[in-house]
Amino acid sequence: MVEELSVLRRVDWGANFGWPYFEGNTRKNGGEPENLVFPVYDYGHDVGVAVMAGYPCRDCGIPKLDGAILFGDMSGPIWAIGSDGVSRLDAERVDILTGWAQGPDKSLYALAYNGIFKVVER
């Protein structure tokens, strides 16, 4: 089993993200229709257990993350995906990531069972 992060653009409304033919980028069944939309990133359950949707970093005060999407897994790891690919952030593990928020100062926050964590540059 894998977790996947997909991007839904306005032009993709009604898109087929591959189920039941693919799980993430891994083929499960043949005979898939054309024009499937594949995930931008996927990972196995050896890495995490449940992807938590991403949040765009736009003018969030961290120039190297500007334009990237932050996302994570309920088990703790947090990543950024940008035009240069996916990188795991040097972040302390959070206890059960539940979501993301942006403050009035445009800072991003990771929401977890053990608190609210501001995303800052180290």
Cite the ranges covered by each PLM segment.
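Beta-propeller domain segments
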Residues: M1-S87, D105, F117-R122
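Conserved blade-ending motifs and adjacent loop-strand segments that build the rim/top face
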Residues: G85-P104
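Short, exposed beta-strand-loop hairpins at the edges of beta-sheets
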Residues: L108-L111
